[in-house]
Amino acid sequence: MEKLTRILAVANGIEDGALVLRKSVALARRFGAHIELLLFGLADDLEAATLCAVLAYDKVTVASMHPGVESTTDVILRRVFAAQPDLVVKSPAGEHPLKRWTLDDNDWRLANECPAPVLLVRHAPWASPIRFAAAVDVADDETSDTARSILHAAGFMALGCHGNLDILYSEREQHDDALRMERAEKLAQLVREFQVGCERIQVFDGAPEHVLPPVVSARHYDVLVLGAQSHQPALKNLLGATNSRLVQATEGDVVLVKAAGRAEGNGVHDESLREKRSYESEQFA
């Protein structure tokens, strides 16, 4: 994450739009970013314009979306590849009466295929200063690449928001001291690479999927930064289990970040280059 000049905010109706736009504007003010609001559902354009006026932020474009036969995720991805935002903001798609958070397959798919970080927001307001946490793993090359992207995004956002950042790492290796030291040095090197003066490394012992969720739950972070699920089957199961438990543990918002240069998809990127915009009518607020 090198910059934050364009935010793509996605909402399903006016009520959801109020939540998503409020937090998008809170970030945009800090970075001077432009917001494009994709408004799905039977939304009233006048209500959307009024909402933008109430927030008193004039760098907002409102687009009423009518996806037709396409899935909402396909429409979002098509717009992402066309507009190339630096951040996508939306509320989580999944719901469960017994869980704080539930991300459905569409959320995970969006995070895996979207080249920009995806911020999933809930109703809880942010503290001042904002409390960020980044959960990382440096067990091998792929998880280290993801950790680098996580620290880059988390450090950039924390610095721009004048927030606090905790870096959470749990070492699952309990016997090989040389391997433990190698990973500790790798983590320290990554932190130095993205040093912004406000982060704290916190190292725990044990399997991260068991150790870190209680830590996250007890500390009430405003924003938790995680890696999107891996495309390699073995790591996908491992990272998916850890991330799912961390997502369920937090009361705050979640940023899902993909390793730099990793792209997954089903052709939506190529289709976006054909300027297929018949499903969209744009207005300015």
Question: For each predicted feature, which ranges?
Answer:
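Short, charged/polar "capping" segments at the starts of alpha-helices
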Residues: 17, 43-49, 142-144, 175-182, ...
